[in-house]
Amino acid sequence: MQGKDRKLLNIELGRVSSEKYRELPDSGIVVVLDNVRSAHNVGSVFRTSDSFKVDKVFLCGICPVPPSAEIHKSGLGAEDSVGWEHCEDTMVAVERLRNEGYTIVSVEQTVNSVKLDRFRPYATQESAEGTSQESAAETSNIGPIPSKKYALIFGNEVDGVSQEVVDASDFSLEIPQFGMKHSLNISVSAGVVLWHLTLERLRTKNAEKL
């Protein structure tokens, strides 16, 4: 019989200071919020971004920005550890990130979206050989980490990612859903997608050790 389990104490969690956090290696992932209106959601995205070591959060358009009591409350102060920047227009952030070598990904339900479970962000050239052009994004013929950088765009609570931004993206990524609503809160979507990329990154690093 397995021994009794227990919750970890706060001192056992391996938490780092804001200064140490900023010294950690970059993940190659940034989050772009396209006119997200809720300060609570923005704070939640900061909190999730801190957990998965997102390099930066871009707050675009009408997004609330720090300092904000609601952002601070829902984010547990993560806006102090995760770098952020405000852009008046999401397209300005998109073009800048493209010029910096990021693959631009809209997290949105579209006609040609790639389902998240089929997305392999850190697949090597060899693992993608023999893949059809239509499924190129699903295998990510891109070279191993850390050569690939992703800008993940999450949209407004009502309208989602704007069509202009979708058009400017390299591809769209969709979270498979099976219920009646086919709608997740933006902060929940961010958590699902960021965990997927984190899991793939961990798998890639573990495979390289074999």
Residue positions per predicted region:
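Post-transcriptional modification and biogenesis factors for structured RNAs
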Residues: M1-L210
